[in-house]
């Protein structure tokens, strides 16, 4: 699906912030944005995780992922609005 491709691109650009790792910060900021028909992102906002570095990384992930692939013609919309949680979880060792 188009959503699956978008999610895969976003996830491929994820880097757990070093400072957050050191502080053992976890969270799930939500990114809210619109993808225009040509794949360009607009109206990007963040619902905070409570940790500034995680929120900044979530924003960076969207910006570096843009532009996304064009919205397929089969999707009869000029834009798609998405809300996606970005989960930052440290693995237990």
Enumerate the language-model features and the residues they cover:
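Intrinsic-disorder/low-complexity signature in envelope-associated proteins
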Residues: 1-7, 34, 40
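Short amphipathic alpha-helical segments
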Residues: 1-2, 50, 54
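An alpha-helix initiation/capping motif
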Residues: 4, 25-29, 80
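Solvent-exposed, polar/charged alpha-helical surfaces in well-ordered, non-transmembrane soluble domains
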Residues: 4, 8-12, 56, 60-63
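Short, positively biased Gly/Pro-containing turn/loop motifs at secondary-structure boundaries
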Residues: 15-23, 59-93
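Long, acidic/polar E/Q/S-rich protein-interaction regions used at subunit-assembly interfaces
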Residues: 18, 42-43, 47, 56-57
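Short tight loops/turns at secondary-structure junctions
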Residues: 23-50, 62-65
């Amino acid at each position: 699906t188009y959503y699956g491709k978008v999610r895969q691109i976003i996830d491929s650009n994820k880097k757990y912030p070093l400072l957050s790792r050191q502080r053992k910060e976890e969270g799930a900021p939500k990114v809210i944005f619109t993808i225009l028909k040509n794949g360009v992102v607009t109206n990007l906002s963040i619902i905070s995780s409570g940790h500034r570095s995680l929120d900044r990384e979530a924003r960076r992930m969207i910006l570096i992922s843009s532009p996304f692939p064009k919205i397929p013609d089969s999707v009869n919309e000029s834009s798609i609005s998405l809300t996606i949680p970005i989960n930052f979880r440290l693995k237990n060792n």
